[in-house]
C-alpha cells in the first residue's frame, strides 16, 4: 500500500498491510461519499482533533485533577506535542503530570513532547509558552527524557519503527526542594493601571484618519 499522503505532511513509504476484500456493497441513488483530506495542518483531521480533545478533557481532569487546560497544537499533527497548564502546589508535580498524561490513553502515548506550564500561561499562545520555557526551565534540571517507548509507526524520525523517545519540559515556577534560590518577581501592571490605560488608549495612540472619506 502506498505511497499515501498523510496527516504528517509527508508521503508514507509503500509497505505491506492487511488486505481488505469487498464482496458487495449497496448504495442509494445520488449517495454522498464522506471522507477527509489529509495533509499538513490546518486540515480536516486537525479540526476533528481539537474537537476530540475537548471531549477528553473531563477524563483528563478526573484522573489528573491539577490539569487546568491542555492543548495539542495542530502544527504538531494534533498529538505529537502537548502543552498542559496546571495549578501547581508541590515539588515534582509537573513530572507526575507528564507521566500521567502519557499513560492515560493509548493515543497520548504517541505524544513525543509534553510541555507543562503554570496556570497563568496561555497555552494557545506560543509567545507565552516560549516565555515560560525561557524563564522557568533549566535544561540540566527540568528535562525528563524517556527512551524505547511506544511511538507512532508513521513517525520516521524515530530510530526504530514503533519505538522512540519522549521528552518532558517542566516550564513551571520552581518551589520547595526544586530550587535553592529565591524566585524572581514578575513584572505586572496593577488592574487599576490597566483600566486607566485602556480608557485613554485612543488618546495616546490615535487612529489614522482615512482621507478617502473626506
Residue spans of the language-model regions?
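Charged, compositionally biased interaction regions
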Residues: 1-214
Amino acid at each position: 500500500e502506498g505511497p499515501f499522503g498523510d496527516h504528517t505532511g509527508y508521503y508514507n513509504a509503500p509497505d505491506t498491510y492487511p488486505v481488505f476484500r469487498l464482496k458487495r456493497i449497496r448504495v442509494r441513488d445520488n449517495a454522498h461519499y464522506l471522507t477527509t483530506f489529509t495533509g499538513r495542518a490546518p486540515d480536516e483531521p486537525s479540526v476533528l482533533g481539537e474537537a476530540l480533545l475537548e471531549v477528553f478533557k473531563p477524563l483528563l481532569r478526573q484522573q489528573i485533577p491539577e490539569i487546568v487546560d491542555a492543548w495539542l497544537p495542530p502544527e504538531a499533527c494534533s498529538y505529537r506535542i502537548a502543552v498542559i497548564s496546571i495549578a501547581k502546589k508541590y515539588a515534582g508535580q509537573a513530572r507526575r503530570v507528564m507521566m500521567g498524561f502519557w499513560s492515560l490513553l493509548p493515543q497520548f502515548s504517541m505524544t513525543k513532547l509534553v510541555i507543562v506550564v503554570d496556570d497563568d500561561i496561555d497555552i494557545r499562545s506560543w509567545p507565552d509558552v516560549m516565555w515560560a520555557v525561557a524563564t522557568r526551565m533549566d535544561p540540566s534540571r527540568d528535562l525528563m527524557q524517556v527512551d524505547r517507548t511506544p511511538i507512532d509507526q508513521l513517525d520516521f524520525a524515530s530510530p526504530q519503527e514503533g519505538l522512540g523517545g519522549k521528552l518532558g519540559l517542566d516550564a513551571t515556577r520552581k518551589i520547595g526542594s526544586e530550587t535553592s534560590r529565591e524566585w524572581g518577581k514578575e513584572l505586572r501592571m496593577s488592574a487599576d493601571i490597566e483600566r486607566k490605560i485602556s480608557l485613554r488608549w485612543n488618546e495616546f495612540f490615535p487612529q489614522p484618519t482615512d482621507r478617502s472619506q473626506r
